[in-house]
A protein has these predicted regions:
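Alpha-helix boundary/capping residues
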Residues: 1, 46-47, 84-88
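Short secondary-structure boundary segments
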Residues: 34, 55-56, 109-110
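Generic internal hydrophobic packing segments that stabilize the cores of diverse globular domains
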Residues: 40, 46, 78-81
Length: 119
């Protein structure tokens, strides 16, 4: 499963890019993050984001999404991360911190671009 790169906006307007695991609920792109991360603060203050996912087997095949964070949920966030870890790593999530809290950011796509160039 391909990693995504999430672009959020810093207070000065510069982008901050983070590799993330992503999910899709049929409407929203879902990003799971540990509470207190810089990307969380950026999305809370400035909900416009961009995400790009490239196919590791052909990096000229990708999907790019621009959208807005429309909801943040903590309920079920730990279980969601466990499921993401199974999909991305094939095993339980190994990096829990004591008292760790997680959030799921729901991103509503506003523009989606796909590209496929066969090598």
């Amino acid at each position: 499963t391909a990693f995504a790169h999430l672009a959020t906006l810093m207070a000065d307007g510069t982008p901050q890019i983070t590799p993330v695991w992503v999910d899709f609920d049929g409407v929203h792109v879902l990003v799971n993050s540990k509470v207190g991360r810089l990307k969380n603060a950026n999305m809370a203050e400035r909900p416009a984001v961009a995400i790009e996912i490239s196919d590791p087997a052909n990096t000229y095949r990708y999907v790019s999404v621009r959208g807005k964070v429309v909801a943040v949920e903590r309920d079920g966030a730990r279980e969601h991360l466990v499921a993401l870890s199974q999909r991305y790593r094939g095993e339980p999530y190994p990096w829990w911190s004591a008292g760790e809290e997680r959030e799921i950011f729901k991103i509503l796509p506003e523009r989606v671009v796909t590209r496929v160039i066969e090598e």
